[in-house]
Amino acid sequence: AFAGVLADADIKAALAGCAAADSFNYKTFFKFFAIIDQDHSGFIEEEELKLFLQTFSAGARALSDAETK
């Protein structure tokens, strides 16, 4: 799903980071999820997804309705 979106080196690095059994860092995953799930509902709603780019930079644009469908 990420092929063609992320650089191959980034994908390989991410997979290498959790290649060994029991090495997946769920705390890091949920930390990132919590940043996007701004209302802490346990879901990422469309309105939160629209602001996804702003998690990287406050000045980033909001995604359009078409981009979040």
UniProtKB/Swiss-Prot annotation:
Cross-referenced Gene3D superfamilies: EF-hand
Coiled coil: none
Annotated disulfide bonds: none
Modified residues (N-acetylalanine): 1
Span of domain EF-hand: 24-59
Function: In muscle, parvalbumin is thought to be involved in relaxation after contraction. It binds two calcium ions.
Any further remark recorded for this protein: Is regarded as an important allergen.
Protein name: Parvalbumin beta 4
GO terms under cellular component: cytoplasm
